[in-house]
């Protein structure tokens, strides 16, 4: 678990994932391509694109193409993503969105997600959340979990 405290930044540059993500990958001794499932806080569509880029799942500036190419679709994409519907479709519980990210990641690792979206052989998952005011002052946390 890596938590990065608030820091001044410009929304044109990056999200807090640019700090918490690399630290989490280093501590877990894995890289973004090893992740089988990602549960990422999605308060707005731009938030998702920025965090996918800053976590290293795609190149900076290529988040839109990464998503539109179908990479986030469970069963067919390179990085199944927010299979619970995410905050934009299912579970935006005000300031408690981070925990829902961990819950769905654990369901995937245990093989307990809905059968239509269960990621086959999911043994490594990432949960990431950002809070505060994206683009000015915010904090982020990245958790990488492995099935035993």
Task: Show which residues each predicted segment covers.
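Beta-strand segments within the central parallel beta-sheet cores of soluble alpha/beta enzyme folds
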Residues: 5, 32-40, 61-69, 79-82, ...
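Conserved beta-strand-centric core segments of catalytic alpha/beta enzyme folds
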Residues: 47-51, 82-148
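Conserved beta-ketoacyl condensing-enzyme motif
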Residues: 34-54
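Hydrophobic alpha-helical scaffolding
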Residues: 14, 38, 92-95
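Short, well-ordered amphipathic alpha-helical segments that serve as non-catalytic structural scaffolds
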Residues: 14-28, 104-111
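Membrane-interfacial loop-to-helix junctions in multi-pass transporters
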Residues: 72-75
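Single conserved hydrophobic/aromatic residue that forms the stacking wall/gate
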Residues: 1-11
């Amino acid at each position: 678990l890596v938590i990065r405290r608030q820091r001044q930044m410009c929304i044109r540059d990056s999200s807090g994932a640019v700090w918490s993500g690399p630290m989490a990958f280093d501590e877990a001794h894995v890289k973004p391509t090893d992740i089988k499932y990602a549960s990422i806080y999605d308060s707005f569509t731009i938030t998702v694109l920025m965090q996918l880029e800053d976590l290293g799942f795609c190149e900076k500036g290529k988040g839109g193409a990464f998503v539109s190419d179908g990479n986030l679709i469970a069963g067919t994409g390179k990085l199944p993503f927010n299979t619970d519907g995410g905050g934009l479709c299912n579970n935006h519980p005000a300031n408690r969105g981070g925990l829902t990210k961990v819950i769905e990641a654990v369901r995937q690792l245990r093989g307990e997600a809905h059968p239509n979206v269960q990621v086959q052989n999911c043994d490594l998952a990432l949960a990431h959340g950002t809070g505060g005011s994206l683009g000015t002052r915010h904090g982020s946390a990245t958790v990488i979990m492995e099935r035993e």
